[in-house]
From Swiss-Prot:
GO terms for cellular component: cytosol. Belongs to the class I-like SAM-binding methyltransferase superfamily. rRNA adenine N(6)-methyltransferase family. RsmA subfamily. This is Ribosomal RNA small subunit methyltransferase A. The keyword Iron-sulfur does not apply. Its main location: cytoplasm. It comes from Neisseria meningitidis serogroup A / serotype 4A (strain DSM 15465 / Z2491). Keywords: Cytoplasm, Methyltransferase, RNA-binding, rRNA processing, S-adenosyl-L-methionine, Transferase. It is found in: Cytoplasm. Pfam families: RrnaAD.
Length: 259
């Protein structure tokens, strides 16, 4: 079979470390009847061991050459191939509670994670290879340098745990950054339920818009000092000092005042 060269425009770095591959599959714990979706199967490093354990495996792939390769594999009859951009993919179009796994293209990881949060109610768990810097931000606690909008928003939907550190030499071609595997398990209302999710999302985005400024300055168009203090937020604190549940509480307090 003709060798496939990684394409930079698709953010392709192909995992080749057999130990890491085995660790990922063991973390996913696929059972024969599970509904599993793999994002970016690439050269099938994870696809093959998953397919061996599953009756059916959905894969989402944008690269036409890779799609053609997938169709020639010995286990191709187990694959349901969805060709196209994963950012446009309808995850709800696949019935059942889903496990989602993938070596995500680093150039679209943040918008893809926000998209996946929208389907959290129909997900059992997710396991992703990502740039380690992104995983650090996802799991970060308040008062840490990595804590920000991404962490707050994803922690609203998921319990998350970094599972595996992955060095650059585990890939071909080797990326210029370290990678990590993260497990994401949907947890409803772990930090409280936002009465108006769009308001909550807007508030969090504004809060972290200028990290060096106080929460009073960043949220001045939405909240005054009295509003902040009503839910236990010090107006002089910066956004990274405020726990996710405080953002939910503030959003609900402001939404309640507007009624």
């Amino acid at each position: 079979m003709k060798e496939h060269k990684a394409r930079k425009r698709f953010g392709q770095n192909f995992l080749q470390d057999t130990r890491i591959i085995s660790d990922i599959v063991n973390a996913v714990r696929p059972q024969a009847d599970d509904v599993v979706i793999e994002i970016g199967p690439g050269l099938a490093a994870i696809t093959e061991p998953l397919a061996k354990k599953l009756n059916r495996l959905h894969v989402v792939e944008i690269d036409r050459d890779i799609v053609c390769r997938l169709k020639t594999l010995p286990f191709a009859d187990k694959l349901v191939i969805h060709e196209g951009d994963v950012l446009q993919f309808d995850f709800n179009g696949i019935a059942g509670k889903k496990k989602i796994v993938g070596n995500l293209p680093y150039n679209i990881s943040t918008p893809l994670l926000f998209k996946l949060a929208e389907v959290a109610d129909d997900v059992v768990d997710m396991h992703f290879m990502l740039q380690k810097e992104v995983v650090d931000r996802m799991v970060a606690a308040p008062k840490s340098n990595d804590y920000g909008r991404l962490g707050v928003m994803l922690q609203y939907f998921f319990d998350m745990e970094m599972l595996i550190d992955v060095p650059p030499e585990s890939f071909d071609p080797a990326p210029k950054v370290d990678s990590a595997v993260v497990r994401m398990i949907p947890v409803k209302h772990r930090i409280g339920k936002a009465d108006d999710f769009e308001h909550f999302a807007k508030l969090v985005k504004l809060a972290f818009h200028q990290r060096r400024k106080t929460i009073r300055n960043n949220l001045k168009e939405l909240a005054g000092d009295d509003d902040l203090q009503a839910v236990g937020i010090n107006p002089q604190d910066r956004a990274e000092h405020i726990a996710p549940e405080k953002y939910v509480a503030l959003s609900n307090y402001l939404a309640g005042k507007a009624v």
